[in-house]
Design a protein with these regions (language model features):
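Conserved active-site and cofactor/substrate-binding residues in soluble primary-metabolism enzymes
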Residues: 2-10, 39, 92, 111-114, ...
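A short C-terminal boundary segment appended to hydrolase-like catalytic domains
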Residues: 93-139
Length: 139
């Protein structure tokens, strides 16, 4: 999908609108490409408290605090059915891959997973101290 505007230029304009006394800034980078999310993390390192990637529904294992004090993860994951493909019933998704025909996806049933992160931020500086992935399975 082609963006309406370059997110790397746009984020600078949006950050400039935030009052200078605001120290804790959270950015949700909703994108398909992991490389774009990683580049945004580096671009914003030291300028924001947190960059969390979303969209793919698959939690990544690369959470860390970057050198400038920005907590980062490429994709936090999702909250939804565990035994499916990104929350959808696996049979329909597999059939679409196997026959290359459009198919309506149905939400999977069963156990629920919740992926999230716990981030500790110094409120006086806005720098992250830590980021921890948390994954829960709910029956």
């Amino acid at each position: 999908m082609t963006p309406l505007d370059d997110p790397f230029r746009t984020v600078g304009c949006e950050l400039a609108k935030i009052p200078t006394d605001v120290k804790v800034i959270f950015v949700d980078m909703h994108a398909e490409a992991t490389s774009e999310k990683m580049a945004m993390g580096w671009h914003l390192d030291g300028k924001v408290s947190v960059v969390v990637g979303t969209h793919t529904h698959v939690a990544t294992a690369d959470s860390r605090v970057l050198p400038g004090g920005t907590a980062y993860i490429t994709d936090v994951g999702m909250t939804g059915p565990h035994d499916g493909v990104i929350g959808m019933d696996k049979r329909g998704v597999l059939q679409r891959f196997l026959d290359s025909m459009p198919a309506r996806f149905v939400v999977a049933e069963g156990d629920i997973q919740m992926n999230t992160v716990l981030i500790d931020v110094d409120e006086s500086t806005g720098h992250a101290r830590s980021i921890e992935r948390l994954n829960f399975r709910l029956d």
